[in-house]
Amino acid sequence: MDFSPPLPANHRRIIVAGLLSLATAMGIGRFAFTPLLPMMLHDGVITLGGASWLASANYIGYLVGALFCTFRPFSKPTLVIRMGLVSTIVLTLGMAAPYEPLWPYLRFLAGISSAFVFVYTSGWCLTQVALRGHASMGAMIYTGPGAGIVLTGLAASAMVATGWSAAGGWLAFGALALGLTVLVWPVLTGRNTLAPTGGTPTTQVQTAGEHSTGEVALLALAYGVAGFGYIITATFLPVIARQVLVGSPWLDLFWPLLGCGVIAGALVASRMKRVRDLRWMLVFCYLMQAAGVAMGQFLPSLLGFALGSLLVGIPFTAITYFAMQEARRVRPQHVAPTIGLLTALYGLGQILGPPLAGYLISHAASTSEGFSTALEMAAGSLLLGVVFFAILIRRYPVTT
């Protein structure tokens, strides 16, 4: 894909457009389900078991979309972004329909749309910002998912306080997606072609040698367990808080707090100076996220859930950011397939998390006990990732 057009806007407009595009596709299209889930449970339109499968349908869609983008790229990125945003609006509004059998299909398609918008927004915006001489500012767009989480989380909190129905919440979020898309639309302009017309292919720019298959496989496994590690918290946080902090007025603020952590983590990761071995940064991020996942269980208080939300959110973008750089380092001649492998295993972890939580809840003495077991397993998977990275660091030292 060649994301280079005439220069239609200044770099700040492009960064804001990218940020809002990701806020729409990720914060609303992918993650709006989390703050609305307690409302759906309260309305009696879904059970926790059904919610687990709805979440997995979305994550399966995201995996399918991400892999499709990796191996079957489209030639018109801005058109793909626009269509993905329109799809996000329609599919979000569709969740207000009182027809439960339709919902898994809507969430699956929303997952595909969010993946397309994420991949093509990233490619287009980063290229445009670089063409204008501000490449280092491009990573600012990755605050978008966190901004979307904060926006939907605060909105859902207000809806709960004022007695909204879940259907009303879906309609409101669809309208919010429409408003954000209207702001983004004029910036998404420019020429797009399938591939550069000349010069050295991008896969040949790197001159470093290929690393061993064992190293790549271990990196993929290490990244894959992170998908399972965070997803139970990212899917059920408001519900878990209601099980532990019964009657607290702050129950719906933990999710937007997690979004604040995502924003902070994206800003810090994008401004870091070059690190010789990024695997140490990944170890640190995994330990931080494992602590966040387990925090509410070992410190079941307002402070514990607040700290846990931040500790899960801060490494969220950073883990992906660092892992993708590692993929480029170990497979410089085959970057896309390597990223596809990492994405696939991470996606499988996400897909497995919610149904496993649903199974544990249905076979536990109480909902709280089921969630506790699921979160312990999630934290354990992140610690397993730390072990994988420790092996990588020891067996495959960075030499350049």
Regions found by a protein language model. Give the residues of each.
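Extracytoplasmic gate region of multi-pass secondary transporters
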Residues: 34, 215-256
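Conserved MFS/SLC helix-loop-helix module at the cytosolic interface between two early adjacent transmembrane helices
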Residues: 64-99
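Helix-to-loop junctions at the C-terminal end of transmembrane segments
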Residues: 65-77, 265-278, 361
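Helix-loop-helix hairpin linking two adjacent transmembrane segments in secondary transporters
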Residues: 100, 137-192
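Cytoplasmic helix-loop-helix junction between adjacent transmembrane helices
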Residues: 108-144
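C-terminal transmembrane helical hairpin of 12-TM major facilitator-type secondary transporters
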Residues: 277-323
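A late C-terminal transmembrane helix in Major Facilitator Superfamily
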Residues: 333-366
